[in-house]
Regions:
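Conserved small/polar residues in nucleotide/adenosyl-binding loops
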Residues: 227-234
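Active-site cofactor/cluster-binding pocket
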Residues: 1-180
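Non-ligating segments of multi-cofactor redox enzymes
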Residues: 149-221, 225
């Protein structure tokens, strides 16, 4: 139509959904439910097929199998590093999107991306432009289809580990009832009663240990010998 879309809500049934960070799978974010039956779900991860299956929650497995969702995996992290893009995976993943979603003819979409990259980065040098072009070409073909096992249709999560009486403390209940649902972006489903133990604003200490985001692909390490050498040279 001619009227702009001003809807303040997310699309809930999309033809294509992509998970750009594998930590969202581990945390149980319910992204798969936003894929319409027969749609496409792309996951950026460094996992093998077996590792991917191990990390997927049972509820997501059931939805994928029962709604014929097409699942594709891509390691944009490694690809970006190999073509000289460092940690910048967005170009690789955008290229994969155009190749899979088919909202435009793939060849046209990739050429548009290359033209935009040339225009945007030519001032930074030909090497930067070439790296972007390589990322575009790589992303268009580097994904692989994951064959969904038939038993995913009836998948069940492993039985939760029962906490001992000693560890069934207020902090454990707080994490289970509040922090975990909120952390996987499911906080809107919590009833008011879940917050009643904290109606006075008091919360148990120590919960930060359970709120690790886990979104970093790599972490820095400190070379104490190098630091000592530099410090000695400065004296």
């Amino acid at each position: 139509g001619d009227s702009p879309i001003r809807s303040p809500y997310y699309v809930t049934k999309a033809d294509f959904v992509a998970c750009h960070n594998p930590s969202y799978i581990v945390k149980g974010f319910k992204m798969v439910r936003d894929v319409k039956p027969g749609g496409t779900f792309l996951v950026n991860c460094q996992w093998s097929d077996e590792e991917f299956a191990e990390h997927m929650p049972a509820v997501a497995k059931r939805y994928i199998a029962n709604n014929n969702v097409n699942v594709y995996l891509i390691d944009a992290i490694d690809l970006a590093a190999k073509v000289g893009m460092g940690k910048r995976t967005n170009t690789v993943l955008q290229s994969a999107f155009f190749a899979l979603a088919k909202v435009l003819p793939a060849e046209d979409a990739l050429q548009y991306m290359k033209d935009a990259a040339t225009k945007s980065y030519m001032k930074k040098g030909q090497a930067i432009v070439d790296a972007n072009h390589k990322a575009i070409d790589a992303g268009a073909t580097a994904f692989r289809k994951f064959e969904v096992p038939a038993d995913w249709a009836t998948a069940e999560d492993a039985a939760p580990v029962e906490l001992s009486e000693e560890t069934k403390s207020a902090i454990a209940q707080q994490v289970k009832n509040l922090l975990e649902p909120i952390d996987r972006m499911d906080g809107d489903s919590l009833p008011v009663s879940a917050f009643m133990p904290h109606v006075d604003g008091q919360w148990e200490l120590g919960a930060a240990a359970y709120e690790k985001r886990g979104v970093a692909v790599s972490v820095p390490t400190w070379d104490c010998l190098l630091y000592t050498s530099d410090a000695a040279d400065d004296r």
